[in-house]
């Protein structure tokens, strides 16, 4: 199982939100580059970065910081948030990003998604964020009438190989992942799944590993030290 430490960028800082609410933010580190270096030092193999400002604005607003992170670490970096054009995708790759995560565009611009997947194949990940089972977009501010299962099936047909699934109600809560929704997703698609939201303990990670989930994104639990990064990397290596 892959472990992805999370760095969420807002106004140039590393923050965590509670249940996706932008008004409920906690600054975890004023220097996201330093945080990336810390994660790498403790053994992270890949970093997961979300441009929260970009998710709302519809364009990357933290590109200079993302570029600095890519230059500061030797491990791959995957980035999501506000990426809604081929130019934006190409910019991220040009500054050293390894994989790009598309969210809102996956729901509203299938032509762009199909073209991007055709060009970059496994380098394109789709992020599906759900609220009560329905897909949320534009920085989680809008909730659609499309179920997360239906969107995942559409993504699989297009050729998307990896999906990041986030249950917004769990994000930043340390309440444990939404195992039921993940199990239902597994039954409906064969894509690789990365779980995000609510992971609070080594036991949560072991449960996801037992389900054969491809990867897990861990944010608040690392910052609040309910999960030790070195320990969880060792545990998943042995599983």
Swiss-Prot record:
One of its GO terms (biological process) is L-tryptophan biosynthetic process. Keywords: Amino-acid biosynthesis, Cytoplasm, Histidine biosynthesis, Isomerase. GO terms for cellular component: cytoplasm. Signal peptide: none annotated. Its EC number is 5.3.1.16. Pathway: Amino-acid biosynthesis; L-histidine biosynthesis; L-histidine from 5-phospho-alpha-D-ribose 1-diphosphate: step 4/9. GO terms for molecular function: 1-(5-phosphoribosyl)-5-[(5-phosphoribosylamino)methylideneamino]imidazole-4-carboxamide isomerase activity. Transmembrane segments: none annotated. It comes from the Bacteria. The active site is at residues 8, 129. It is an enzyme of class 5 (isomerase). SUPFAM superfamilies: Ribulose-phoshate binding barrel. It is found in: Cytoplasm. It catalyses: 1-(5-phospho-beta-D-ribosyl)-5-[(5-phospho-beta-D-ribosylamino)methylideneamino]imidazole-4-carboxamide = 5-[(5-phospho-1-deoxy-D-ribulos-1-ylimino)methylamino]-1-(5-phospho-beta-D-ribosyl)imidazole-4-carboxamide. Belongs to the HisA/HisF family. This is 1-(5-phosphoribosyl)-5-[(5-phosphoribosylamino)methylideneamino] imidazole-4-carboxamide isomerase.
């Amino acid at each position: 199982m892959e472990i992805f430490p999370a760095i969420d960028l807002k106004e140039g800082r590393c923050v965590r939100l509670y249940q996706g609410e932008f008004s409920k933010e906690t600054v975890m580190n004023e220097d996201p580059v330093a945080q990336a270096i810390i994660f790498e030092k403790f053994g992270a193999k890949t970093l997961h970065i979300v441009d929260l400002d970009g998710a709302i604005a519809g364009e990357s607003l933290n590109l200079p910081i993302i570029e600095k992170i890519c230059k500061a670490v030797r491990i791959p970096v995957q980035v999501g948030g506000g990426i809604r054009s081929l130019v934006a995708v190409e910019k991220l790759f040009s500054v050293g990003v390894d994989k790009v995560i598309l969210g809102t565009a996956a729901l509203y611009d299938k032509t762009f998604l199909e073209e991007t997947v055709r060009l970059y194949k496994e380098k394109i990940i789709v992020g599906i964020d759900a609220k009560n089972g329905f897909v949320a977009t534009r920085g989680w501010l809008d909730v659609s009438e499309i179920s997360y299962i239906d969107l995942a099936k559409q993504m699989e047909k297009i050729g998307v190989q990896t999906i990041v699934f986030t249950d917004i109600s769990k994000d930043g809560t340390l309440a444990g992942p939404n195992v039921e929704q993940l199990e239902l997703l597994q039954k409906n698609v064969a894509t690789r799944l990365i779980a995000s939201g609510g992971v609070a303990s080594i036991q949560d990670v072991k449960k996801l590993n037992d389900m054969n989930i491809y990867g897990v994104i861990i944010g608040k639990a690392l910052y609040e030290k309910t999960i030790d990064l070195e320990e969880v990397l060792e545990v998943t290596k042995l599983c």
